[in-house]
């Protein structure tokens, strides 16, 4: 698992860690998923193993972590690693990766909204953590590599700015989108967040 170094570090510091492969990811079954499945998984884990003190999410999982923490899985802190504040950032990057034109990108966004049975205002209200930030008593850690090509850092910077003094920003160099998970700076920052008096 890409989270293995972080899990080891947290456990060595005495934390109990619940890690899972999201639906249709890693060793989990399924061929397709959307953000609702990730949030359902977080809710089930919270009910069985919670309450949690920190939720850590990477990439799309970071958006799911933010959404869960803002709605049905309240926690004292969230760590967002190589993530984004809203679905639009992922849709835009997917379109850029495939060199989609504006009309095709618009159809992709519309299909996403139809799948969720929501219009744009409902998607924003439910999933945009800049326009609808975390609760005021929830701390935020944002970690992003400056050279991340799979999910550039501009949306993470918006997320950090939207949360003011309760957000800590850690920017790495040369780690990219995946290796950032095991970077020393990331591990140290997540441990510090989990051990902070606000959280414990």
Feature names for model-found ranges:
Residues 72-119:
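Hydrolase active-site cap/lid region
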Residues 149-155:
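Conserved alpha/beta-hydrolase "acid-adjacent" motif
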Residues 114-133:
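Active-site nucleophile elbow and catalytic-triad environment of alpha/beta-hydrolase enzymes
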Residues 56-65:
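Gly/Ala-rich beta-loop-alpha elbow adjacent to hydrolase catalytic centers
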Residues 1, 7-29:
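Conserved alpha/beta-hydrolase
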Residues 133-137, 142-144, 148:
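Short beta-strand/loop motif that positions the catalytic acidic residue
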Residues 30-53:
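Alpha/beta-hydrolase active-site loop
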């Amino acid at each position: 698992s890409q989270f293995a170094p972080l899990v080891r570090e947290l456990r060595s510091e005495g934390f109990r860690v619940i890690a899972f492969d999201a639906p249709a990811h890693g060793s989990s079954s399924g061929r397709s998923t959307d953000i609702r499945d990730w949030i359902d998984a977080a809710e089930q884990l919270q009910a069985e193993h919670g309450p949690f003190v920190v939720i850590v999410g990477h990439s799309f999982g970071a958006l799911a972590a933010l959404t869960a923490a803002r709605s049905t899985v309240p926690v004292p802190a969230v760590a967002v690693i190589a993530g984004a504040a809203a679905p639009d950032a992922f849709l835009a990057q997917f379109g850029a990766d495939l060199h989609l034109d504006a009309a095709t990108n618009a159809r992709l966004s519309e299909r996403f909204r139809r799948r969720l049975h929501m219009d744009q205002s409902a998607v924003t209200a439910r999933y945009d953590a800049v326009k609808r930030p975390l609760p005021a008593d929830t701390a935020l850690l944002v970690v992003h590599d400056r050279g991340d090509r799979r999910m550039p850092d501009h949306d993470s910077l918006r997320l950090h700015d939207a949360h003011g003094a309760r957000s800590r920003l850690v920017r790495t160099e040369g780690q990219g989108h995946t290796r950032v998970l095991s970077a020393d700076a990331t591990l140290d920052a997540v441990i510090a967040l989990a051990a902070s008096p606000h959280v414990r």
